[in-house]
Amino acid sequence: MIPLQKDNQEEGVCPICQESLKEAVSTNCGHLFCRVCLTQHVEKASASGVFCCPLCRKPCSEEVLGTGYICPNHQKRVCRFCEESRLLLCVECLVSPEHMSHHELTIENALSHYKERLNRRSRKLRKDIAELQRLKAQQEKKLQALQQWLGQLEHMPAEAARILDISRAVTQLSSLVIDLERTAKELDTNTLKNAGDLLNRSAPQKLEVIYPQLEKGVSELLLQPPQKL
């Protein structure tokens, strides 16, 4: 194992991963680490029952990771994420009747799993936005053509309304993409529940209300279920 560099603290570098600090967390002794790096260290140290600073080896409290890492019911470190209840669980929670039949993931697997789902959903919505932009351009061309034919002025309000519907859909989907990408980038145990809620809110069947007035072919394309998003 590569020895931890004590002088890296002044450079804003995590002594564990040797990279720039991400979501810096300070131990009781004042040393800074990436939150993910320190969390993994705590999980490995939990087997011995003693958590020490990885740099100076002084005893530390697991509470340095924040309240999101401590079970509010049993005051013990959380170790699993329940997908059904979307709650962080400690060892005592795992044996409680309400969670016995639930599916739980380790914290590390949950973070990886939800980050991948958020990124996939974001990529899917970006494709939807591109398709909507293409449709918007088509509708604008139709409107321009109609404007050249005064005899067809009665059709202009409907075309203009369709463009407005598409513009609104693009705006709302763009906002969802921003939320998905930000949540994936900042995902930690404090935001796992929000990640599940966001995936539910951006599910294809939920998005139907965003563009109910679009042409049938495009609506079917956008609302088709992605592969396990």
From Swiss-Prot:
Keyword Zinc-finger: yes
Keyword check for Metal-binding: yes
PANTHER family in alphabetical order: E3 UBIQUITIN-PROTEIN LIGASE TRIM
Single annotated GO MF: ubiquitin protein ligase activity
Record EC number: 2.3.2.27
Reaction equations catalysed: S-ubiquitinyl-[E2 ubiquitin-conjugating enzyme]-L-cysteine + [acceptor protein]-L-lysine = [E2 ubiquitin-conjugating enzyme]-L-cysteine + N(6)-ubiquitinyl-[acceptor protein]-L-lysine
Record protein name field: E3 ubiquitin ligase TRIM40
Annotated zinc fingers (RING-type), start-end: 14-57
